[in-house]
Amino acid sequence: MKRIVAAVLAVVMLVALSGCISTDNNIDRYGADVVKHGAMAFMPTLDSLGAYTDVDYFIRMDEGVFPSYSMRLIVSYGEAEFKAEVKRLETAYTYLQEPQTADYSDEAYYTMPLTEFSAAGFDFRVAVFEDTVYPKNFGMVGISQAMHKIAYLWFYSPDHDYICEADEDKAAQMTEFLNYHFEMDKLG
């Protein structure tokens, strides 16, 4: 009997600690998700996006012991509108100018290793906004000249302390971060 109780408790603890990860891509819930998860300072409203031809929305919610929320909005444009939106983005956001570091227990870490990088066909720039705390709450804007697309990525996790150690490949770690939290490697 004790073994059964111990086994049940072990399974319950494992499930509780591993958490529940869910994803959604229903664009009809986008506005409510932005408000619910506190992304209003960074994520654009659909009405502010100009004359787009398509929009792809994705949210990843990890509700476990160490929760995190990742929101991805990729907007497609015709050529002329794309050029206008890219120009607008130059002043729509303030962008990070230097990588961000932190020291924990005599070890150096990057809370934001790069200010600009390329991944998944997009050239990303890390944004600065009112509630930015790298890497706990931040956003990135990605531009794909080849596809005429703009990606808005927002991340929040109160428990995320750093993206990579000082001696790791910064670009590879940012790509890994994007693939894990935003599923950028699964884009068609």
Residue locations for each model-derived region?
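Extracytoplasmic electrostatic interaction patches
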Residues: L89, Y93-G188
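Repetitive helical segments and hydrophobic/amphipathic motifs
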Residues: V11-V12
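Positively charged n-region of N-terminal signal peptides that target proteins for export
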Residues: M1-I4
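N-terminal export/targeting and maturation segments
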Residues: C20-R88
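C-terminal motif of bacterial Sec signal peptides marking the signal peptidase cleavage site
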Residues: V15-G19
